[in-house]
Swiss-Prot record:
It comes from Bacillus anthracis. The keyword Transmembrane helix applies. Transpeptidase that anchors surface proteins to the cell wall. Recognizes and modifies its substrate by proteolytic cleavage of a C-terminal sorting signal. Following cleavage, a covalent intermediate is formed via a thioester bond between the sortase and its substrate, which is then transferred and covalently attached to the cell wall. This sortase recognizes a Leu-Pro-x-Thr-Gly (LPXTG) motif, which is cleaved by the sortase between the threonine and glycine residues. Important for growth in macrophages. May be critical in the early stages of inhalation anthrax. This is Sortase A. Contains a unique N-terminal appendage positioned within the active site and in contact with catalytically essential histidine residue. This appendage modulates substrate access to the enzyme. It may increase the efficiency of protein display by reducing the unproductive hydrolytic cleavage of enzyme-protein covalent intermediates that form during the cell wall anchoring reaction. Disruption phenotype: Disruption of the gene results in dramatic attenuation of the growth of the bacteria within J774A.1 cells, a mouse macrophage-like cell line. Disruption does not affect the development of acute anthrax disease in the A/J mouse model. One of its GO terms (cellular component) is plasma membrane.
Amino acid sequence: MNKQRIYSIVAILLFVVGGVLIGKPFYDGYQAEKKQTENVQAVQKMDYEKHETEFVDASKIDQPDLAEVANASLDKKQVIGRISIPSVSLELPVLKSSTEKNLLSGAATVKENQVMGKGNYALAGHNMSKKGVLFSDIASLKKGDKIYLYDNENEYEYAVTGVSEVTPDKWEVVEDHGKDEITLITCVSVKDNSKRYVVAGDLVGTKAKK
């Protein structure tokens, strides 16, 4: 085999490998979005579990990659509701407690004994730095944007009051503040776990779910 042929084969192999490396993140992102859509469709008309939430320290959970999100299996026994944010086209299951497994499939509760529409309803979600996947888009929310929670009986409507950036030790953001509100928390990026984006919103209405 002459040198020219060897060079050609090596060049082709490098091209193929390069294409795979470049294309894999896009493929994983597509699969993650597809899995998320399937999860939402699966929970939209199901009977949700009771609000029996527990505290799990999510700060000790490693940041997953898109392939892990795409391959995660939704545990329907953990689903207690659904969250919808129309302004960023977000639709996710709400799962009880921020376990590693639950955070791969949707938004997860942060505190013990959380009840939708009462006190500070806090939810955590991964920022995958990929539009349309989990909590990647919540930092772009604006004051007045609507957030909707759903359980078996009701739709809870919240209006965003602000978005801030805090360090992970600022647990006061999820504490009750004497009003009915919502708090959404995520890392600032898939590569940066040193700070959190925090979205705050006030409850503006509750009505029976259609």
